[in-house]
């Protein structure tokens, strides 16, 4: 049986995540306040950020940048796309 949460990103009830997706207090907040669809939207946005900015998840500075963007994307709704980003045809 799935959990329902009030998704902060969607501002509506949504199916909750099955597990805590991120370590620490932020992970607990995501688990409690973010739905599956919003998390999938973040993963797509994160992939775009990694590719467009040539980020390495191993680099501590890049990880800090991604964490800040995660918070902006899910909780502030003001994450930006990289400068010069052009969406693929069909998006």
Curated annotation (Swiss-Prot):
Q: Record's NCBIfam families? A: PRK05408.1 (NF003817)
- One biological-process term from Gene Ontology? cellular response to oxidative stress
The membrane-spanning stretches of this chain are none
This protein's record includes keyword Heme: no
Which family does the record claim for this protein? Belongs to the Fe(2+)-trafficking protein family.
Organism equals Xanthomonas axonopodis pv. citri (strain 306)
The protein depicted here goes by the name: Probable Fe(2+)-trafficking protein
A single Gene Ontology CC annotation of this entry is: cytosol
Keyword annotations for this protein? Iron
Query: Which lineage ranks, top first, belong to the organism behind this chain?
Result: Bacteria, Pseudomonadati, Pseudomonadota, Gammaproteobacteria, Lysobacterales
């Amino acid at each position: 049986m799935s959990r329902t949460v009030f998704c902060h990103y969607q501002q509506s009830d949504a199916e909750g995540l099955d597990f805590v997706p991120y370590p620490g207090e932020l992970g607990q907040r995501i688990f409690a306040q973010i739905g599956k669809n919003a998390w999938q939207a973040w993963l797509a946005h994160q992939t775009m950020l990694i590719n467009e900015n040539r980020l390495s998840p191993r680099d501590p500075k890049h990880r800090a940048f991604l964490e800040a963007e995660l918070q902006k994307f899910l909780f502030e709704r003001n994450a930006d796309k990289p400068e010069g980003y052009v969406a693929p045809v069909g998006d």
